[in-house]
Swiss-Prot record:
Gene name linked to the record: Prex1
Modification Phosphoserine occurs at: 314, 991, 1186, 1191
Organism expressing this protein natively: Mus musculus
CDD domains to which the protein is assigned, alphabetical: DEP_2_P-Rex, PH_Collybistin_ASEF, RhoGEF
Gene3D superfamilies xref list: 2.30.42.10, Dbl homology (DH) domain (1.20.900.10), Pleckstrin-homology domain (PH domain)/Phosphotyrosine-binding domain (PTB) (2.30.29.30), Winged helix-like DNA-binding domain superfamily/Winged helix DNA-binding domain (1.10.10.10)
Region annotated Disordered, chain positions: 1-33, 793-813, 1022-1047, 1099-1129
Name of the protein: Phosphatidylinositol 3,4,5-trisphosphate-dependent Rac exchanger 1 protein
Record's keyword terms, sorted: Cell membrane, Cytoplasm, Guanine-nucleotide releasing factor, Membrane, Phosphoprotein, Repeat
Function: Functions as a RAC guanine nucleotide exchange factor (GEF), which activates the Rac proteins by exchanging bound GDP for free GTP. Its activity is synergistically activated by phosphatidylinositol 3,4,5-trisphosphate and the beta gamma subunits of heterotrimeric G protein. May function downstream of heterotrimeric G proteins in neutrophils.
Matches recorded under Pfam families: DEP, RhoGEF, SOS1_NGEF_PH
Compositionally biased residues, Low complexity: 1109-1122
Biased composition (Polar residues): 1030-1047
GO biological process annotation, one example: G protein-coupled receptor signaling pathway
Length: 1650
């Protein structure tokens, strides 16, 4: 046995290979060599003895740790442990008989130490110790057989946060680092140890010469321990793995470094690859283990000697010579495109290859596989190994931090209580140190309360709190010590930053990356060092300087800590070696830059980090549940989920679902990537909860269908021209079954083009139409494309009494038309072939990536043309036309009243007014015409960019290139990370999207993000030459020679409209509207008083008419006004706060739902010193029945006013007088004074002084009412009527004056332009908000994903937030006003226009419409320009999910902000116009930041008010975490925005374009609706969205930091936004020269680049 044993030892132990032959020629080599060999063997034997003793001591220490840290603590806190779920049975299962094992090993260690006393020597004997204890080692049988059960239980317990935290705290107090080895690692150590003994004894036997006294005992001990292990199944399996590793290592000659069995558990992959390094290309055998990659040279067979033949009997019959090893922790892998030949491949052309970078030594080499399949196998294995390692580490770090933070929070609250009084101000030398505690007092207190059981645990806990940033030494000089050293909680000195080095580092890192790459004077750039160029690097000290200059960090130490955090979390690394970040001149590089350098778009898909899965073209269908099912069945066909059948007449068929269509997603779940069984389960779950379905169904842009040509009746309606469109289809008809849907455009009939024809030309091809032209339509329930179409159809039906018939018809008609046999009757009938153009298609791309947590995430990115935007623009134009018509009528009436022209100035004034009124009349006619154009427009469903000026048309009121960019992210919900890491380590991987046998479907997280891109709203119209008179007149008035056309077109509205003029015009309009509403409300109070008096005075004959008709009827002169137009001064609850109650029957028309322009009436109670002060004193007697009445004999003597009626009368009269006071205040104000001044040349009844004196009439009227109350109640109604008549006349005079002033200051030439730009902006805003609203109502919106908040909670929170604080609309402009004249004009236009959006309000109503398919929302416009109200009609399901305030009718306020930054440098001396352009941008940004700050304050108050902190300390910590972290992030972003908007002197140029990503993140976190604009809506805005989406994925969805730019690049060049370029082929929109690096990296390739 000696020869092979020692031979094996030589091969493994002599790196030089010199000792490979001595035994073979032993007799000849002489005594000297033999002695040398013997001495070497004994030296190695001593090493093995030391290892056995050392590892045994460590093992006993581990067992003691498990006993003291876990078992003893659990026993000390029995009640607490049971409450958390650690029952006695659970503890027994987890730890089994580990204490018995400890007792055995204490004795075993004592015996080993006795044998090897005082220090191990090579002559010591050890074999007998093992033989003595071999029977006692049977104690392992129970432990090993229970082990699998224990691990299963641990996974379940780890799902309970309280248990997970308790187990982590046990580990912490025991002094072990919680992130090193998880508990399951410790529980595995007994099995690993018992399996290790045979390996150690085998090594000892090798090194024990035959003549050694211990030789026989060691051989016996080896066999005995093998027998012990083979008797236990679990250890047998473990032994086999370890033996395989040991055997493999024994076949590698010259092995260096630690043994495989010490650091690895299994071989993952092996194979031969070509390795290119240092100019050589060689074949090498590679072995990939967990944690290690080894490569060897194959040793050629040596023939001749007996020993050599034996040594060739190994793996694959060959031997290896060790050539190198790389710890996978410091190894990076990079794919290489086929055909590449570069520096690392030494000029060799690479095929099926990849690069491996040993970052510890900064050495690169290239590997090449024989085939592409083999390459993929290696890359997959390398990535799997990396993900297992990273997810384990990240998960453990996150869990440990949570536990320590919660523990710190709990202890802090306890220490702050008066009983404990540990935290206090303390004296030190001559100073006082505020709010601190002493280390030794802290440890003593922890012992006293039972938090720890011994002093060491207290020190461990203190050190953990210090390392995790919860406490610190008051001078930051000491670690935690159990001494009289002062420490302070960071909460008390404001230095606590929650989790900044863990999760928040992700968003901080992404933010820093974007800012650094947005600089015009880059900090990150290519740098030369020692004749080598390092690409995209930054010296550590330069980065520290920059962080300090920007205010991100206050000290260099803090900046270094941030740099270390960035390196530790995969953002950047040292370019040469794996060293920590230092404040030195060493170079560091962002991983994301490495991913981008030297790559072309072709090799992106081979990367395993972020890859494209599928391109889709689809249509979104909305299918509500029916009584029994959804009306369709699915099947699996070619691994795709396909519609098997659709029920005739079902809601699914009505939505346009057809058999054979592929389904991509159901309610945002990407079912096409799931097994079919799971898809059925998902459908059942949705049906059980009665949820409507949102299906994404594959479709084509154009398709040809065959519609049966029945001679009896048509089952569809066609309208419109060029192209004709399907107006409606009959539900359940054969046309629907054939695939005809409302809204489709008809391009061809039977192969003949009809795209430029009308509906009649299409219908002529159908027999039914030719036979019965007038009555060709069948009896169907019609399904329309939009609600407007449905309304139009109802209106054209004629008399209203026919409507019920229409509803009855379908019920009787449907059975006839839906019968199956009817199909067979017409089997041979003719068909008409229709080629159709589908509208509202969604272009999408599906991507996937592995997140930092090791989960597979899927992203569906889509662009959607906003539905109904043309019709919405038409409705806005109609509202403007109505507004203008009323204005023209009122002004016309006024002009007619004053026909006498006295002076020349009167004549001029009259003439100007006439001209303006004529111009407004032409505008009204145009708006009506444009509205009709837009309503009939169907295709294309969006407006393309146009660079040339053109005659004004309806499309000029619609946004250009407006697309909603949706990003839907889905991934499995995270399980507790310890459990997750367990399943990865031990091979029980849960399916990422699949069925868990214990839980049914794995729960998934779904989130939808929405950003709109568009061209900035603009005015690009030229005066028409050949228009009709109306259009000509309009254009003449807009661009008349007097108006100076060139200057108007060259400059924007903010330049042309003076701020003062805009303000005074708005003031006039607001006053006009306020007067109108105040008068209306006053009349409603009068109505209530009259009604009240009529119920008190029984004899109706004697009572006066309760209410004069003139008081109630609406005056025709008052424009229809949104009664909530000035929302900031209204009470949003929808019910006015009044101080009296009205019965239900009175409520109907009492006007109590009316919203007032004045402040809430709740303060009326404090106004009792008014006219009613006298009556309130006499509240217990009736005025009508009192002795002072004088005419008492006219009344029945028992006439009394009940006390409840008295109170109502008091309230009504008080409100009436308050309203009168309010009207007086409005009429005497400065605005009215200015109006009189402006119109002094127009002859009116009164001057300003005479007008003010009219108030005396109303004072007299009030006195009269007081007298009536006390002396003559019968005349009270007539006194009130007199007062109201006076007030009404007073108000009418005031309104007339305002109308004249308005007419004078209205610039009719600019109003058209304002309307066009405003209309474009409002349409985009409404469509964006509506998409985000629907996402929130479907519980898919989540702007808080990085704080692990569920989409359901985030959506509900956002809905409550907007209901309380309004909607933040964030417009981001990338226009270049300094270099492009047109873009400066655009910016000046939209600055004015967006401020006007704040006057718009949104409200909600329920939609009771079932004759329109695939529409959740439709819009209605009410009000005037100054108080426009958009009403969102929502279907019942979504309406029921609105916050109760919005359901009740309250309106939402808009807060519009515009941040603008040109993507071009402003370095150097500016050209003349540039300075003004830069100042314009700064002014816009400053105003917007102020508005954002106001909104943030409201939001902060809203959340803090709702966050009543729980009493439980653990729950408090979580709650504070959820609140403080987002607030900290918002504070930081706001600070950054201030540095961009108000830069220090001379620093403006050094800030770059960082404002763009920072403002996006700030508004995203505030829950804003985001709209990004550039000159055309094509290039800059779409790239900005790709960047923002990649940043969101990294911040909230675990995209690896190194993949941020890679993801941006793929989404930009291969994502759905390339469709926008395809739709605008002739439009050029290049990126500005000198754009920052961030915006140049991902530009689409120029022609010829690829």
């Amino acid at each position: 046995m000696e020869a092979p044993g020692s031979g094996g030892g030589d091969g493994g132990g002599d790196p030089g290979g010199d000792g490979a032959h001595p035994d073979a020629r032993g007799p000849v080599s002489g005594p000297c060599a033999a002695a040398r060999d013997s001495e070497r063997q004994l030296r190695l034997r001593l090493c093995v003895l030391n290892e056995i003793l050392g590892t045994e001591r460590d093992y006993v220490g581990t067992l003691r740790f498990l006993q003291s840290a876990f078992l003893q603590r659990i026993r000390q806190n029995v009640a607490d442990s049971v409450e958390k779920g650690l029952t006695e049975e659970n503890v027994k299962v987890l730890f089994s008989n580990i204490e018995d094992i400890l007792e055995v090993h204490k004795d075993f260690l004592a015996a080993l130490e006795y044998c090897l006393h005082p220090e191990p020597q090579s002559q010591h004997e050890l074999g007998n110790v093992f033989l003595k204890f071999k029977d006692k080692f049977c104690v392992y049988e129970e432990y090993c057989s229970n082990h699998e059960k224990a691990l299963r239980l641990l996974v379940e317990l780890n799902k309970v946060p309280a248990v997970r935290a308790f187990l982590l705290s046990c580990m912490l107090l025991g002094g072990r680092k919680t992130t090193d080895i998880p508990l399951e690692g410790y529980l595995l150590s007994p099995i690993q140890r018992i399996c290790k003994y045979p390996l150690l004894l085998k090594e000892l036997a090798k090194r024990t010469p035959g003549k050694h006294p211990d030789h026989t005992a060691v051989q016996s001990a080896l066999q005995a321990m093998k027998t012990v292990c083979s008797n236990i199944n679990e250890t047998k399996r473990q032994m086999e793995k370890l033996e395989a590793l040991e055997q493999l290592q024994s076949h590698i000659e010259g092995w260096e470094g630690s043994n495989l069995t010490d650091i690895c558990t299994e071989l993952l992959l092996q194979g031969n690859l070509l390795k290119i390094s240092a100019g050589n290309i060689q074949e090498r055998a590679f072995f990939l283990f967990d944690n290690l990659l080894v490569y060897c040279k194959r040793k050629s067979r040596v023939t001749g000697s007996k020993k050599s033949t034996k040594r060739t009997k190994s793996i694959n019959g060959s031997l290896y010579i060790f050539r190198g090893r790389i710890n996978t922790e410091v190894m990076e892998v990079e794919n290489v495109e086929d055909g590449t030949a570069d520096y690392h491949s030494n000029g060799y052309t690479v095929t099926n290859g990849w690069k491996i970078h040993n970052t510890a030594k900064n050495k690169w080499f290239v590997c090449m596989a024989k085939t592409a399949e083999e390459k993929q196998k290696w890359l997959d294995a390398l990535i799997r190994e990396r993900e297992q390692r990273e997810s384990l580490k990240l998960g453990m770090e996150r869990d440990a931090y949570v536990m320590i933070a919660e523990k710190g929070e709990k202890l802090y609250h306890m220490m702050m209580s008066k009983k404990v009084n540990l935290i206090k101000d303390r004296r030190r030398k001559l100073s006082t140190v505020p709010k601190c505690f002493l280390g030794n007092e802290f440890v003593a207190w922890l012992l006293e309360i039972g938090e720890i059981s011994k002093t060491e645990e207290g020190v461990n806990l203190g050190q953990a709190l210090l390392e995790n940033g919860i406490i610190h030494h008051v001078s930051d000089k000491h670690q935690f010590k159990n001494e009289q050293v002062m420490y302070r909680f960071r909460y008390d000195d404001g230095t606590y930053k929650a989790r900044s080095e863990l999760e928040d580092i992700m968003s901080k890192g992404v933010r820093l990356y974007c800012r650094l790459h947005s600089l015009y004077a880059p900090v990150i750039k290519d740098r030369d060092y020692h004749l080598k160029t390092y690409k995209s690097v930054v010296p550590g000290s330069k980065l520290v300087d920059w962080l300090l200059a920007q205010g991100d960090c206050q000290t260099r130490e803090e900046a270094v800590a941030l740099g270390v955090g960035l390196c530790n979390n995969g953002f950047m690394h040292h370019v040469l070696e794996k060293s920590e970040f230092k404040d030195e001149s060493q170079y560091f590089r962002f991983h994301a830059d490495e991913e981008m350098e030297g790559t072309s778009s072709k090799n992106k898909q081979l990367r395993n980090d972020f890859k494209l899965v599928e391109n889709i073209l689809a249509k979104r269908l909305l299918i509500p549940p029916q009584e029994d099912d959804y009306g369709f069945d699915l099947e699996e066909k070619n691994k795709a989920v396909v519609v098997k059948s659709v029920q005739r007449g079902s809601l699914a068929e009505m939505a346009g679902l057809q058999a054979g269509r592929k389904i991509y997603s159901i309610n945002e779940d990407l079912v096409f990537l799931r097994p079919f069984s799971e898809v059925e389960t998902i459908l059942n779950q949705f049906f059980c909860s009665r949820r409507p379905l949102r299906l994404l169904v594959a479709t084509k842009a154009k398709e040809t269908i065959k519609v049966p040509d029945h001679p009896e009746a048509l089952s569809f309606q066609i309208r419109g021209t060029a192209p004709p469109c399907v107006f409606a289809v009959g539900r359940g008809s054969e046309a629907v079954a054939a695939g005809l849907c409302a809204g489709q455009c008809i391009l061809k009939v039977n192969g003949t083009s009809v795209a430029n024809d009308g509906a009649l030309e299409v219908l002529e091809h159908f027999q039914a139409f030719r036979n019965h032209r007038e009555e060709a339509l069948g009896l169907y329930q019609w399904v329309y494309h939009s609600h407007e179409d449905a309304q139009l159809a109802r209106a054209s039906q004629g008399a209203p009494d026919e409507d019920p018939q229409e509803d009855d018809q379908p019920d009787s008609a449907l059975p006839l038309l839906s019968l199956g046999p009817q199909l067979s009757l017409h089997e041979d009938s003719a068909v008409v072939s229709l080629t159709l153009d589908n509208v509202h298609l969604e272009h999408g791309v599906v991507y996937e990536y592995m997140s930092t947590a090791g989960a597979k995430c899927h992203v569906l990115e889509k662009i959607v043309e906003p539905r109904g935007c043309f019709r919405l623009a038409a409705k806005i134009l109609e509202a403007f036309a109505v507004d203008d018509s009323i204005f023209v009528q009122n002004c016309g009436r006024l002009m007619a009243m004053s026909s006498a022209i006295v002076t020349m100035s009167h004549y001029e004034f009259h003439n100007i007014c006439d001209t303006k009124l004529e111009s407004i009349g032409q505008r009204i006619a145009c708006y009506q015409e444009f509205a009709a154009q837009l309503k009939s427009r169907v295709s294309p469903p969006f407006k393309q960019a146009s660079l040339e000026p053109h005659p004004l048309c309806g499309l000029d009121f619609c946004p250009t290139n407006c697309h909603v960019n949706l990003m839907e992210v889905s991934y499995p919900k995270t399980t507790p990370s310890v459990g997750r890491s367990f399943s990865i380590r031990f091979g029980r991987k849960p399916s990422l999207i699949g069925l868990d046998p214990e839980q049914g479907l794995n729960p998934m997280a779904y989130t939808q993000h929405c950003i709109t891109t568009m061209a900035a709203p603009s005015w690009k119209c030229s005066p028409a030459v050949d228009e009709d008179s109306q259009g000509q007149g309009l254009n003449d008035s807009s661009y008349g020679s007097a108006s100076g056309a060139p200057s108007q077109q060259d400059r924007g509205l903010s330049f042309l409209l003076k701020q003062e003029d805009r303000e005074i015009q708005d003031a006039y309009l607001q006053l006009f509207t306020k007067l109108d509403v105040a008068l209306k409300e006053m009349k409603q109070y009068v109505t209530q008083i009259n009604r009240l008096l009529s119920t008190i005075t029984e004899p109706t004959s004697a009572a006066p008419a309760p209410c004069d008709p003139s008081l109630v009827e609406e005056t025709s002169s008052s424009p229809p006004v949104s009664e909530e137009s000035e929302v900031d001064r209204t009470d949003h609850s929808g019910i006015k706060k009044v101080c009296f109650k009205v019965s239900e029957d009175e409520q109907e028309d009492s006007g109590h739902d009316t919203m007032s322009y004045r402040d809430s009436y709740s303060e009326c109670n404090s106004n009792r010193d008014s006219v009613l002060s006298y009556t309130s004193v006499r509240s217990n007697s009736s005025y009508l029945g009192s002795d002072e009445m004088g005419s008492g004999d006219e009344l029945p003597c028992d006439m009394r006013i009940p006390s409840d009626k008295q109170d109502k009368l008091h309230g009504c009269l008080e409100h009436l007088f308050n309203q009168v006071d309010s009207i007086h205040a409005l009429l005497k104000g400065p605005v009215m004074s200015r109006a009189f001044e402006e119109t002094r040349h127009f002859p009116m009844k009164h001057s300003w002084q005479e007008f003010k004196q009219k108030e005396e009439c109303t004072v007299r009227g009030r006195n009269l009412i007081q007298i009536s109350i006390q002396e003559d109640p019968w005349n009270l109604p007539s006194s009130i009527r007199t007062l109201v008549d006076n007030i009404q006349q007073y108000v009418e005079d005031g309104k007339n004056q305002l109308l004249l002033a308005l007419l004078k200051c209205t610039d009719t030439e600019l109003q058209l332009r304002r309307d066009a730009v405003f209309c474009q902006a409002l349409v985009a805003a409404v469509c964006t908000f509506s998409e985000q609203l629907l996402a929130a109502l479907d519980y898919r919106y989540n702007n808080n994903g990085e704080y692990e908040e569920s989409s359901r909670d985030a959506s509900r929170k956002w809905l409550e937030q907007v209901a309380a604080t309004g909607v933040l609309l964030h417009w981001q402009s990338l226009l270049a006003p300094a270099s492009v004249k047109e873009e400066r004009t655009m910016l000046e236009d939209i600055w004015v226009t967006l401020s006007e959006l704040d006057n718009v309000t949104f409200s909600f109503k329920q939609l009771d419409e079932n004759s329109v398919a695939n529409t959740n929302v439709f819009y209605h416009i009410e009000g005037s320009r100054q108080a426009l109200k958009v009403v969102f009609y929502l279907d019942g399901f979504h309406f029921s999910r609105l916050p109760s305030r919005l359901e009740g009718g309250a309106s939402l306020r808009l807060h519009t902000v515009l941040f603008t930054k040109a993507l071009e440098s402003v370095e150097g001396p500016p050209p003349p116009g540039n300075q003004a352009a830069e100042e314009l941008q700064q002014e816009i940004n400053a105003q917007s930041l102020e508005k954002v700050q106001q909104y943030y304050r409201k939001l902060r108050a809203f959340y803090l008010e709702r966050s009543n902190l729980p009493t439980d300390a653990g729950a408090t910590a979580v709650k504070i975490d959820q609140l403080i972290r987002p607030i900290n992030a918002l504070d930081e972003l706001y600070r950054l925005m201030k540095t961009f908007v108000h830069p220090k002197a001379g620093a403006a140029g050094s800030l770059g374009a960082g404002l763009i990503p920072v403002s996006s993140e700030l508004c995203y976190r505030l829950g804003a609706c985001q709209i990004t604009m550039c000159g055309t809506g094509m290039q800059r805005s779409t790239l900005s969205v790709s960047l923002e989406q990649a940043a969101i994925l990294a911040r909230s969805h675990g995209l690896l930091p190194k993949c941020v730019m890679q993801a941006t690049d793929i989404m930009r060049k291969q994502g759905p936004r390339v469709e926008i370029l395809a739709k605008n082929l002739r439009i050029k929109d290049p990126m500005p020269q000198g754009a920052p690096r961030l915006y140049q990296l991902c530009q689409p390739p120029v022609d010829g680049d690829l």
